């Protein structure tokens, strides 16, 4: 018998178990193995090993999926690194990185190579369709130009499938399964103004292209509207024309439809895979496998796509690299941006991190020379100007449901002038809280230490942390008062205020509640493109990367909230949020205006936003962090525990802390145990210990010791986790 180490999705120390098989199995092969009286999926990690246990106790592999291609050594190296760095069992890390189809106990069908269509010799001898049949003629010209996929042909003519079927019956079409040696992303459109870069864009793209074929990290810092996407696309075109693969990571699912439209216009004949959580499981698995087999040349996805196996990656792009969505906040707590840089080094290719407001970690690396800084200082359209930003002190103003008189006047003027406006606040629901004016009672979530949010249309109170829901009460449970008051300004309340103030305006609310379905974003883009919307009411998701050409006024209602946070990253996040949302104004050739309402107008964040000066803000913030050895000058790990009572969680962490005190490196500081800022979540109470050090190596040694002690926990009431490079306090 041959013995193998098999990765299994179980919370053991490393998740690797020993099984036997009559033959050596290639590492990366998917198998079925017995585990605790059931059959589970496993993946061969090592083969032909010497077992460290009694051979009589070793169980046999039950099924080998021989028709499936094993996952590559480079993919397994990525998961091994991820497991080590984030101190997470290898077996569980492997299965966190796989699509649903590869986690199931049945075989998956491997995707077939794409078909390519062209006119054969007989077809080329035919008379082309008359020019008056312009779409049919366009399809014929496309087939004349060489082998093309059906997706690309449908760009020329939506009826391509039917026409090609007809022409094939005439004996004019040839099909091949072979991948084209050269992809042509510029087909017939090189002179299109959208693809012509300005001087700054061309310089940035040229520098990226000089690094093709070797590892180099670039930080592409460009003001909003400077055309970072065009720089990405220009560099991507060079890689795709070589037949190599590109990985393009986005922070949010809702950015995907807009990007895909641009990809279809620019790279119509490039086989593309799209990977995000709202895709059907079967489609996502097939796209994953197409990428693994090298059939998909362009892979676009959210954070989990960083684990997509790519046999011939030539470029990795991380758009909006500062965005917190790239950090997974449960189970395998990885950061996709950081893993993308590691993958680029592993694959020997450039990685481009792009943002108008880079993370301070990336900016610091660019300033220190670890990353090459590329800057776009002008908007892509020569006529486009940066928006005028005004900071309004609302401390003594009377507000109408959150709106100052100045804000309402600007909205009215812009509507009458035919412009589009965005009213921005980072709060879903009708109002943040329901309040009893007689006794002061507020309605808290029974499962969390958070207030319930009033959703008027659904007639519900909801917790935005654990999703607990209950009907709106008729009276106060403490004093019986029936006159309950909604306090605060959520998107639903703002929407209703605007409808009453401007009844003729088309007001559309955009938040997670209103975009929960698959096609909601595509429908929104269609309505905006057709000038069917006058005012958008939005939350944070509207601040990210969207390009709405007609938008020329942004009103920010509640800019102060995050500044009261205990999180040291709060100013950085607020600055990025305000800069990003301000950048939505004045795209294309329309001058933009931004009005930010605040009760803290003297705060340095607002001065930096008004000046539109990221570099000054970053320098000041980095100087402050350096004084206290905070990231990026120091490194952090949060060790967390939760239990029915916070006292139990703290006792568990403090016991481990006491055990480890004499063993930890002196360079590692320990803070806590202390309750988390939101103590109660989903009927569990949480505490944490922060480990900090200026030595990443010493910190990881300390975390390894902590994990060894925590793994000895046998108290079923206690759950623990480790968060390396945490983004939340």
From Swiss-Prot:
GO terms for molecular function: 3'-5' DNA helicase activity; ATP binding; ATP hydrolysis activity; DNA binding; zinc ion binding. GO terms for cellular component: primosome complex. Binds 2 zinc ions per subunit. Keywords: ATP-binding, DNA replication, DNA-binding, Helicase, Hydrolase, Isomerase, Metal-binding, Nucleotide-binding, Primosome, Zinc. Belongs to the helicase family. PriA subfamily. Helicase and ATPase activities on forked DNA are stimulated by PriB; E.coli PriB does not stimulate this helicase. PriA:PriB complex-catalyzed duplex DNA winding is inhibited by CGS 15943 (CHEBI:131351). CGS 15943 decreases ATP hydrolysis and decreases PriA's affinity for DNA. It comes from Neisseria gonorrhoeae (strain ATCC 700825 / FA 1090). One of its GO terms (biological process) is DNA recombination. Residues 471-623 form the Helicase C-terminal domain. Interacts with PriB with high affinity in the absence of DNA. Component of the replication restart primosome. Residues 209-376 form the Helicase ATP-binding domain. A motif (DEAH box) lies at residues 319-322. CDD domains: DEXHc_priA, SF2_C_priA. PANTHER family: PRIMOSOMAL PROTEIN N (PTHR30580:SF0). ATP binds at residues 222-229. The gene is priA. Zn(2+) 2 binds at residues 445, 448, 463, 466. It catalyses: Couples ATP hydrolysis with the unwinding of duplex DNA by translocating in the 3'-5' direction; ATP + H2O = ADP + phosphate + H(+). Its EC number is 5.6.2.4. Pfam families: DEAD, Helicase_C, PriA_3primeBD, PriA_C, Zn_ribbon_PriA. The keyword Hydrolase applies. This is Replication restart protein PriA. Its cofactor is Zn(2+). Disruption phenotype: Growth deficient on solid media due to a reduced growth rate, 10,000-reduced DNA transformation efficiency, 10-fold increased sensitivity to UV light and oxidative stress, greater than 10,000-fold reduction in ability to survive nalidixic acid (generates DNA double-strand breaks). Does not play a role in homologous recombination-mediated pilin antigenic variation. Zn(2+) 1 binds at residues 436, 439, 476, 479. NCBIfam families: priA, PRK05580.1-4. Initiates the restart of stalled replication forks, which reloads the replicative helicase on sites other than the origin of replication. Recognizes and binds to abandoned replication forks and remodels them to uncover a helicase loading site. Promotes assembly of the primosome at these replication forks. DNA helicase with greatest unwinding activity on forked DNA substrates with relatively short duplex lagging strand arms. A DNA-dependent ATPase. Required for DNA transformation and DNA repair. Binds single-stranded (ss)DNA and replication fork-like DNA but not double-stranded (ds)DNA.
């Amino acid at each position: 018998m041959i013995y193998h180490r098999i990765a299994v999705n179980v919370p053991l120390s490393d998740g690797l178990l020993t099984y036997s098989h009559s033959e050596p199995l290639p590492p990366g092969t998917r198998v079925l193995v017995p585990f605790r009286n059931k059959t589970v999926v496993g993946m061969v990690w090592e083969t032909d090993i010497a077992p460290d246990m009694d051979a009589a106790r070793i169980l046999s592999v039950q099924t080998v999926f021989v028709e499936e291609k094993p996952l590559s050594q480079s993919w397994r190296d990525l998961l091994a690194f991820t497991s080590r760095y984030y101190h997470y069992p290898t077996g569980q890390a492997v299965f966190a990185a796989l699509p649903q189809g590869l986690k199931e106990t049945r075989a998956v069908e491997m995707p077939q190579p794409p078909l390519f269509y062209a006119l054969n010799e007989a077809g080329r001898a035919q008379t082309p369709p008359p020019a008056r049949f312009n779409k049919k003629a366009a399809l014929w010209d496309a087939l004349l130009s060489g082998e093309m996929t059906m997706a690309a042909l449908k760009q020329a003519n939506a009826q391509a499938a039917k026409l090609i079927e007809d022409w094939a019956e005439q004996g004019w079409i040839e099909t091949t399964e072979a991948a084209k040696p050269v992809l042509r992303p510029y087909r017939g459109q090189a002179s299109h103004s959208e693809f012509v870069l300005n001087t700054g864009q061309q310089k940035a793209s040229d520098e990226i292209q000089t690094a093709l074929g070797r590892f180099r990290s670039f930080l592409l810092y460009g003001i909003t509207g400077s055309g970072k996407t065009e720089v990405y696309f220009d560099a991507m075109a060079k890689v795709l024309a070589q037949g190599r693969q590109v990985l393009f990571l986005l922070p949010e699912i809702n950015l995907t439809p807009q990007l895909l439209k641009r990809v279809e216009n620019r790279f119509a004949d490039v086989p593309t895979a799209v990977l995000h959580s709202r895709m059907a499981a079967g489609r996502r698995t097939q796209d994953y496998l197409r990428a693994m087999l090298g059939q998909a040349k362009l892979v676009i996805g959210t954070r989990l796509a960083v684990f997509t196996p790519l046999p011939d990656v030539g470029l990795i792009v991380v758009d909006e690299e500062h965005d917190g969505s790239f950090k997974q906040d449960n189970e395998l707590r990885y950061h996709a941006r950081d893993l993308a840089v590691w993958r680029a080094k592993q694959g020997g290719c450039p990685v481009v991190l792009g943002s108008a407001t880079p993370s301070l970690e990336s900016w610091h690396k660019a300033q220190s020379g670890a990353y090459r800084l590329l800057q776009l200082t002008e908007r892509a359209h020569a006529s486009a100007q940066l928006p005028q930003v005004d900071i309004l002190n609302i401390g003594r103003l009377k507000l109408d449901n959150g709106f100052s008189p100045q804000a309402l006047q600007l909205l009215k003027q812009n509507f009458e002038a035919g412009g589009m406006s965005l009213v921005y606040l980072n709060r879903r629901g009708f109002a943040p809280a329901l309040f009893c004016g007689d006794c002061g009672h507020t309605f808290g979530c029974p499962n969390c230490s958070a207030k319930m949010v009033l959703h008027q249309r659904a007639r519900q109170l909801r917790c935005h942390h654990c999703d607990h829901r209950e009907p709106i009460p008729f009276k106060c449970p403490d004093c019986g008062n029936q006159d309950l008051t909604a306090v605060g300004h959520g998107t639903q309340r703002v929407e209703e205020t605007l409808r009453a103030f401007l009844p003729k305006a088309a007001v559309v609310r955009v938040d997670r509640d209103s975009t929960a379905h698959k096609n909601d974003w595509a429908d929104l883009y269609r309505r905006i493109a057709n000038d069917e919307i006058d005012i958008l009411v939005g939350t944070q998701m509207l601040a990210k990367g969207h390009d709405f050409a007609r938008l020329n006024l942004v009103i920010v209602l509640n800019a102060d909230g995050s500044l009261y946070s205990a999180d040291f990253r709060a100013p950085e996040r607020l600055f990025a949020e305000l800069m990003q949302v301000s950048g939505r104004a004045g795209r294309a050739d329309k001058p933009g205006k931004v009005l930010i309402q605040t009760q803290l107008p003297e705060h340095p964040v607002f001065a930096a936003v008004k000046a539109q000066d990221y570099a000054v803000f970053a320098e000041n913030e980095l100087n402050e962090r350096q004084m206290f050895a905070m990231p990026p000058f120091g490194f952090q790990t949060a060790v967390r525990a939760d239990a029915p009572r916070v006292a139990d969680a703290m006792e568990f962490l403090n016991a481990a802390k006491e055990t480890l005190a004499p063993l930890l490196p002196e360079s590692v500081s320990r803070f806590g145990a202390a309750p988390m800022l939101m103590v109660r979540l989903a009927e569990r109470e949480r505490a944490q210990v922060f480990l900090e050090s200026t030595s990443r190596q010493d910190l990881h040694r300390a975390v390894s010791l902590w994990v060894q002690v925590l793994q000895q926990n046998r108290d079923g009431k206690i759950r623990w986790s480790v968060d390396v490079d945490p983004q939340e306090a």
